[in-house]
């Protein structure tokens, strides 16, 4: 049964209806429509915590989608799933692939920074201070890029940069 037929969530149902209308109205090839349908189903499954199903849909959307900008969002969402499952190396790979296609994706930059920060905290707890410092510096660089793209977001990151003395090159 297609995902849109079993949605109980009002927001998901609304999104599905709107997405179907957009697909009917906008000129798109059959392949583009099919790619978007898989992407939509992936987002719906992801929002319900059905990560395996979401990944299947995203991979199929990725296979069909040719537009680099649209592919960047598919890759970003795949990264989100891997990060949610604690598979940070894979998440980083997908976030970087998304950025290769769309360098104006502050959420991917932020999520990379969050992973490096988390790894820095873990290294600190293990008293691996040089590694922790390196990871925190990497987090700082990615947060600075995200903040440059979206200066009104990432307030906590801005505060962290200031309190850790890493905001010296932050120009918004």
Curated annotation (Swiss-Prot):
It is found in: Plastid, Chloroplast thylakoid membrane. It comes from the Eukaryota. GO terms for biological process: photosynthesis. Pfam families: TPR_1. SUPFAM superfamilies: TPR-like (SSF48452). Coiled coil: none annotated. InterPro entries: PSI_Ycf3_assembly, TPR-like_helical_dom_sf, TPR_rpt, Ycf3/AcsC/BcsC/TPR_MFPF. The keyword Signal does not apply. Keywords: Chloroplast, Membrane, Photosynthesis, Plastid, Repeat, Thylakoid, TPR repeat. PROSITE patterns: TPR, TPR_REGION. One of its GO terms (cellular component) is chloroplast thylakoid membrane. TPR repeats lie at residues 35-68, 72-105, 120-153. It is a peripheral membrane protein. Belongs to the Ycf3 family. Essential for the assembly of the photosystem I (PSI) complex. May act as a chaperone-like factor to guide the assembly of the PSI subunits. This is Photosystem I assembly protein Ycf3. The lineage of its organism: Eukaryota, Cryptophyceae, Pyrenomonadales, Geminigeraceae, Guillardia. The gene is ycf3.
